[in-house]
Regions:
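Acidic, Ser/Pro/Thr-rich low-complexity regulatory regions
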Residues: 1-72
């Protein structure tokens, strides 16, 4: 498996699942699935931020990172 900036296991279960699914889609070069997972990541990172699991800066950085993979 490739090395990624964010390890899904460092985050709560739902966010972990979405990150894992995004990375799998990325490795399979399945852009449609990546876009779908990006939508999940967008809402789940918002929830994680509200719960205090991540900061707003963390969320912004994460979304930029995953968006960058999407555009790669």
């Amino acid at each position: 498996m490739m090395e990624y900036k964010y390890n899904p296991e460092d985050y709560e279960e739902v966010l972990c699942d979405y990150m894992t699914a995004f990375y799998r889609a990325y490795e399979e070069k399945n852009r449609a699935f990546m876009i779908s997972e990006m939508e999940h990541l967008f809402s789940e990172t918002k929830y994680a931020m509200k719960e205090g699991d991540i900061t707003s800066a963390d969320r912004e950085e994460m979304l930029m990172y995953f968006g960058g993979l999407l555009d790669a």
